């Protein structure tokens, strides 16, 4: 299908350019000429462009490197969607600042130390039968040997676990085909205990290994007590992949430094880079994780280190669960083919890719045909007899990802700055493309799963150099999108990454992920359960227990309740905040001056903040997320008084009050305004009821939100009436103003519901009508004309029925408004609105499309 579309795009462009050479230069050509763009550039732009409201085909999750976060963007547009706070505090989301997210971050403390940064490398998606299912994402922290769990229901980090025996883990996260375990492999060997041993004890005491973190899918949590590790020799283990299909149950981990070199550049010895590369080969670790999972159940097969179960090398070897195969020196990536038979190893210092054959490996193991053992007693298989074959690719082969076609694979060449497409079954190179510059990881869509999709490939490059506007010596990273849908790879787009060095990407079809757009009211987003501090409207309160103060607060457009909080200096304050909105994307933020506090509350979410009121004074708090026209008024005061002080209060002058007559006029004015607003609201509710809004869940949620807001008006009306009956007109006006606030919130949700309902039930727009709507909006027409209402200009419903030869008349009027000003009808319109339509310099094509848009409006006139 994509090849067909590719061909059609070329044909369309060819026809376009052929036609236009005989005509005046089109705006399309003018733009290309002005910007120096080729037809190939224009085609690339078409392939990645998403009009407003159109979503991408794929999500891509990228390890954020030094940022300690995970970046999410869409493909093919490459538009960034979110930075997920993982190992590093992230203030916009309140991650690491409110109590609930801080608990997650503090799970990552190591030996009593707060660790507030991470080096995120390899995100991995949860799998079902080797296929991505879109439920969870896992990512490792190389610097501090940690794994995080991200719940894709909310796109938030829900757990961090610290490796109990390793100090650095690069080979994570890697997932078994049904997400039974998350594998995390040691990088730099150390003693597995936390004790000191000199470097001279390297061979005897230092060890590597792999940790199997047991994952409970129902709980969405790693179960530390059910997890275990396998001890490896102190070779420096690198990346891992899990078997699938015929190789299900097995895992494969690369390593370097089979020389067991320990450095010493400061003593005049060769550096690590030289000492670790002397030998011609290193070792691929091959181990049966299903057998290991059975072995660990018997405590005789384990030793306990730092409270964690570890299977020693000798136990794994004795039970036929661990083997080594030589591989070309200093390998990096290891990747199992979608069917599980082929294992592709990347050699950084070798121009060849090595393809191992799982069937051959199994036969050698079954026949116990080994060429020897290493220093630690692990059987070694013959490299040549294990190989399916080798292919010469180029310099600096680092990583691989699989394409949709049988046998297709794409590899990154760091030194050559290239992506190479080749066939691992036929052992031949198919295509190469240059990138910019020095590619590291590589990700074709779902290219590491059992069901690769092809379509696009992302090159995660290490250098950007001259690709973007200069921003000083520290450059952004460059992720490049490549079209792999045809026989030849095509570079489409460069994307600057401004925060951290991205490592591995994990991609998945957007149709597989279904995030929530709101929480069940009172949810703790980090646990997915109802928060102990859940507070509904009307339940707001302040409770004191000794020097502990508990505040139960709500946030809704456009106020925080309570708005005045008075505590004593030295009080321990706990504040529970609930966003009681239901409308999608109505997020509220919360901060208090001087307290180093910030939290983000999505609709329905409850969170907790704790602080000690240890300084006297008055501290404003407010909503940090712009949420309504009266956002700035969404604030309050924390007042901290010293209980040991005697304050002398100065009576402030009262503001000059309005006269009784002026108050009465003001009261009647706002009553009239509220009655008019209420008529609009009732018309909206009537429209929604008549059009059976309940059939559309998103519309229904908006209407529920609108009715919730409207239901609060009755109480305010009672307060207003009571105040008025007591001749307290000032308070009556205040309560009527509160009624207006609730009406505005009601109308906001109801109008959004109406617009969404119209888009759901209206007749589909033609392509011309869609373009006409864009031209109408971008040409400034919507500044004066509101469809279905008289605004600064007339309502345009039925505009094509107001004149003879209406389409021609409207076209002429848009083209040259002044030419119609003399007509009697237009003279009256100009006099009524006191405006003349300016010439918007619309093209003939835009005018034609706008008329098609007007036709669509008339077809659906009863909806406006």
Feature annotation, model-predicted:
Residues 137, 737-759, 808, 835-864:
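C-terminal capping alpha-helices of c-type cytochrome domains
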Residues 635-641, 773, 783-816, 821, ...:
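Gly/Gly-Pro-rich "capping" loops immediately C-terminal to redox-active cysteine motifs
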Residues 542-572:
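N-terminal edge beta-strand
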Residues 645-649, 653-665, 755-777, 864:
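Electrostatic cytochrome c docking/interface patches
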Residues 75, 358, 626-628, 777, ...:
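Detector for the c-type heme attachment site
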Residues 539, 601-662, 861:
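Extracellular/periplasmic metallocenter environments
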Residues 70, 620-626, 772, 778-788, ...:
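The canonical Cys-X-X-Cys-His
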Residues 24-543, 547, 585, 610, ...:
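Predominantly soluble domains enriched in secretory-pathway, periplasmic, or organellar proteins
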């Amino acid at each position: 299908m994509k090849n067909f579309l590719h061909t059609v795009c070329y044909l369309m462009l060819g026809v376009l350019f052929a036609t236009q050479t005989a005509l005046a230069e089109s705006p399309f050509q003018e733009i290309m000429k002005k910007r120096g763009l080729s037809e190939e550039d224009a085609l690339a732009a078409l392939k990645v462009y998403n009009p407003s409201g159109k979503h991408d085909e794929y999500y891509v999750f990228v390890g954020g490197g030094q940022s300690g976060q995970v970046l999410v963007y869409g493909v093919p547009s490459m538009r960034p969607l979110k930075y997920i706070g993982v190992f590093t505090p992230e203030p916009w989301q309140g991650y690491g600042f409110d109590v609930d997210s801080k608990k997650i971050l503090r799970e990552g403390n190591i030996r009593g130390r707060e660790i507030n940064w991470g080096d995120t490398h390899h995100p991995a998606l949860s799998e079902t039968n080797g296929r991505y299912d879109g439920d969870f994402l896992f990512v490792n922290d190389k610097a501090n040997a940690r794994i995080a769990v991200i719940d894709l229901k909310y796109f938030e980090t829900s757990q961090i676990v610290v490796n109990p025996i390793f100090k650095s883990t690069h080979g994570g996260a890697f997932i078994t085909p049904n997400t039974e375990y998350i594998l995390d492999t040691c990088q730099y060997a150390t003693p597995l205990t936390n004790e000191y041993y000199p470097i001279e004890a390297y061979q005897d005491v230092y060890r590597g290994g792999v940790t199997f973190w047991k994952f409970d899918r129902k709980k969405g949590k790693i179960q530390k007590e059910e997890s275990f590790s396998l001890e490896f020799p102190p070779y420096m283990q690198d990346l891992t992949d899990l078997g699938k299909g015929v190789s299900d149950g097995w895992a494969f981990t690369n390593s370097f430094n089979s020389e067991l070199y320990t450095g010493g550049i400061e003593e005049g010895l060769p550096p690590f880079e030289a000492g670790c590369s002397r030998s011609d080969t290193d070792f691929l670790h091959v181990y049966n994780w299903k057998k290991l999972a059975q072995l660990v159940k018997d405590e005789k097969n384990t030793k306990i280190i730092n409270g964690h179960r570890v299977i020693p090398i000798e136990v794994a070897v004795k039970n036929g669960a661990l083997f080594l195969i030589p591989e070309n020196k200093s390998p990096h990536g290891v990747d199992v083919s979608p069917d599980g038979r082929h294992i592709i190893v990347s050699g950084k210092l070798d121009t060849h890719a090595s393809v191992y054959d799982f069937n051959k490996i199994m036969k050698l193991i079954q026949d116990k045909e080994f060429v020897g053992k290493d220093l630690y007693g692990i059987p070694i298989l013959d490299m040549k007899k294990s190989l399916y074959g080798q292919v010469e690719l180029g310099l600096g082969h680092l990583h691989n990802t699989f394409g949709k076609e049988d046998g297709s694979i794409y590899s990154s060449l760091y030194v050559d700055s290239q992506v190479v497409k080749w066939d691992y079954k036929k052992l031949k190179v198919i295509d190469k493309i240059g990138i910019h510059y020095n590619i590291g990881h590589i990700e074709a869509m779902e290219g590491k799963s059992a069901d690769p999709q092809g379509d696009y490939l992302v090159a995660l490059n290490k250098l950007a150099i001259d690709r973007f506007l200069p921003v000083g010596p520290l450059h952004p990273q460059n992720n490049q999108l490549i079209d792999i849908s045809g026989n030849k790879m095509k570079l489409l787009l460069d994307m600057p990454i401004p925060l951290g060095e991205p490592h591995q990407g994990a991609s998945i079809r957007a149709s597989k992920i279904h995030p929530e757009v709101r929480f069940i009211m009172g949810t703790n987003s980090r646990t997915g359960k109802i928060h102990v501090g859940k507070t509904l409207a009307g339940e707001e309160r302040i409770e004191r227990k000794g020097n502990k103060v508990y505040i139960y607060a709500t946030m809704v457009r456009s106020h925080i309740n309570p708005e005045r909080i008075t505590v004593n200096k030295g009080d321990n304050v706990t504040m529970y905040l609930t966003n009681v909105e239901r409308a999608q994307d109505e997020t509220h933020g919360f901060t208090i001056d001087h307290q180093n506090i910030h939290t983000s509350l999505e609709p329905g979410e409850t969170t907790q903040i704790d602080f000690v009121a240890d300084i006297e004074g008055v501290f404003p708090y407010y909503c940090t997320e712009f949420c309504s026209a009266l956002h700035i008024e969404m604030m309050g005061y924390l007042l901290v008084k010293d209980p040991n002080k005697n304050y002398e209060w100065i009576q402030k002058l009262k503001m000059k009050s309005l006269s009784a007559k002026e108050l009465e006029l003001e009261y009647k004015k706002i009553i009239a305004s509220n009655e008019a607003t209420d008529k609009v609201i009732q018309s909206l509710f009537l429209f929604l009821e008549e059009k059976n809004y309940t059939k559309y869940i998103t519309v229904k949620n908006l209407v529920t939100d609108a009715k919730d807001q409207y239901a609060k008006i009755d109480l305010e009306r009672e307060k207003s009436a009571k105040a008025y009956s007591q001749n307290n007109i000032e308070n009556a006006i205040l309560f009527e103003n509160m009624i207006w606030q609730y009406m505005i919130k009601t109308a906001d949700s109801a109008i959004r519901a109406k617009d969404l309902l119209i888009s759901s039930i209206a007749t589909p727009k033609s392509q011309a009508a869609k373009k006409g709507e864009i031209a109408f909006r971008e040409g400034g027409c919507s500044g004066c004309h509101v469809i279905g209402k008289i605004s600064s200009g007339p309502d345009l419903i039925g505009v094509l029925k107001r004149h003879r030869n209406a389409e021609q008349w409207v076209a002429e009027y848009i083209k040259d408004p002044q030419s119609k000003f003399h007509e009697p009808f237009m003279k009256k319109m100009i006099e009524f609105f006191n405006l003349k339509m300016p010439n918007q310099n619309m093209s003939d094509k835009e005018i034609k499309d706008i008329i098609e848009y007007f036709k669509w409006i008339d077809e659906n006139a009863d909806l406006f």
